[in-house]
Structures are given as structure tokens and as C-alpha cells.
Amino acid sequence: MFAIIKTGGKQVKVEPGQEIFIEKIKGEVNDKIAFDEILMIDGQIGTPTIEGAKVLGTIVKQGKAKKIRVIRYHPKKNVNKIYGHRQPYTKVKIEEISAK
């Protein structure tokens, strides 16, 4: 059984037992979370979501991704600036997919 959920402005295909990386959400490690915006379950397509469907998961880790370097550079001018950014993420283990 699989489902497509919408979280953090993205659509993610999930299955029970799978661990996924999503945009940071509030919560501590081992907190239970429920995803309510289910777009599809096993080929049943929602309009736009499936009413009463839920995907339950557990937060495994809150962390930050690898640092990326952003360089601002203007030729022929004395402007050369380097910025760093680490995107926060949440690692979630999918426990259960239920359709009403």
C-alpha cells in the first residue's frame, strides 16, 4: 500500500515502514504526527484530497542538511560576498496509512 502526501509544499510518495526527509515541522524526536493532506492512496485519486484519509508517522530526527555556499559576485566592481546556508529538515518514519 502506498500514498502520496502533500507536506512542505512538496508531494511525497510514502509506504509503511519507510523513512522520509521532509521540510522542517514542529515537534520533538519520537513525537507522533499525522498527515491529513492525502492526494492518492493505491490509485484512488482525491479531488484534490481524499476525505478521512490519514498517514501516521513518528519523528526520527530533526537536523540540518549539508552547508551550501552562495556567492555574490559583480565583475569590474569590488563586490565579492560568500554566504552559507543549511536547510533544516525532519526525518519521519511512516507507521500507518489509513483510508476511510
Swiss-Prot record:
NCBIfam families to which the protein is assigned, alphabetical? L21 (TIGR00061)
- What's one Pfam family the UniProt record gives for this protein? Ribosomal_L21p
Report the protein name in the record. Large ribosomal subunit protein bL21
Q: Does the keyword Ribonucleoprotein apply?
A: yes
Gene Ontology molecular functions:
rRNA binding; structural constituent of ribosome
Gene Ontology, cellular component aspect: cytoplasm; ribonucleoprotein complex; ribosome
Keyword Calcium assigned = no
Role played: This protein binds to 23S rRNA in the presence of protein L20.
InterPro entries in the cross-refs: bL21-like (IPR028909), bL21-like_sf (IPR036164), Ribosomal_bL21 (IPR001787), Ribosomal_bL21_CS (IPR018258)
Q: Which organism is it from?
A: Mycoplasma capricolum subsp. capricolum (strain California kid / ATCC 27343 / NCTC 10154)
Keywords noted in UniProt: Ribonucleoprotein, Ribosomal protein, RNA-binding, rRNA-binding
Checking HAMAP family in the record gives: Ribosomal_bL21
Listed GO biological process terms:
translation
Q: Which family is this sequence assigned to?
A: Belongs to the bacterial ribosomal protein bL21 family.
How does this chain assemble? Part of the 50S ribosomal subunit. Contacts protein L20.
